[in-house]
């Protein structure tokens, strides 16, 4: 956790929020089969394996993402939690920001904030993702396809956040797709 905070992927004013989320996660722990909503879910792989938190340089150039591309969409590619601008075709009406840039402009208010273990982990360990803003009175002509690809030979844990601001009298269709070619575990959160 301390390594994540030291990376400075987020404004330092958010460190207190992240530390509180991590402390609360440590108190709650991972769900067990005794939890009603988790009684049929095997999470033992989380404790049986070692995971490394993804870094910005974990974006492989050797991924054939064309098999995941959806025709007639604007595709935003995120590899191992990090936005790959050079592989993306964002429409000109879309203002794409890093989460750092976005959170410098906005207050970090999680919509429908939940204190579940995976939400708390995402809040505390998030160091990647993408944010985009659609200005007022804007219509995006084709769906926005957010393609999350997990790849690599290492066991990575990825906790990206996607922040979407669609302003008044604007419209867009957003499709999120997840593809994994590795043992990577993703704990994504989308805020609209």
Report the location of each language-model feature.
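Glycine-rich and polybasic anion-binding loops at the starts of cofactor/ligand-binding domains
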Residues: 1-192
């Amino acid at each position: 956790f301390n390594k994540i905070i030291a990376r400075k992927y987020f404004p330092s004013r958010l460190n207190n929020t992240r530390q509180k989320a991590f402390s609360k996660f440590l108190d709650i722990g991972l769900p067990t089969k005794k939890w009603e909503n988790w009684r049929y879910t095997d999470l033992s792989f989380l404790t049986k394996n070692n995971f490394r938190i993804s870094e910005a340089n974990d974006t492989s150039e050797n991924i054939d993402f064309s098999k995941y591309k959806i025709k007639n969409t604007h595709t935003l590619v995120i590899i191992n939690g990090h936005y790959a601008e050079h592989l993306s075709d964002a429409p000109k009406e879309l203002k794409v920001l890093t989460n750092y840039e976005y959170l410098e402009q906005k207050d970090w208010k999680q919509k429908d904030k939940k204190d579940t273990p995976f939400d708390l982990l995402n809040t505390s360990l998030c160091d990647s993702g993408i944010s985009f803003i659609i200005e007022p009175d804007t219509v995006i002509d084709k769906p926005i396809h957010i393609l999350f690809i997990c790849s690599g030979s290492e066991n990575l844990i990825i906790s990206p956040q996607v922040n979407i601001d669609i302003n008044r009298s604007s419209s867009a269709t957003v499709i999120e797709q997840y593809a994994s070619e590795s043992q990577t575990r993703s704990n994504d959160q989308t805020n609209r």
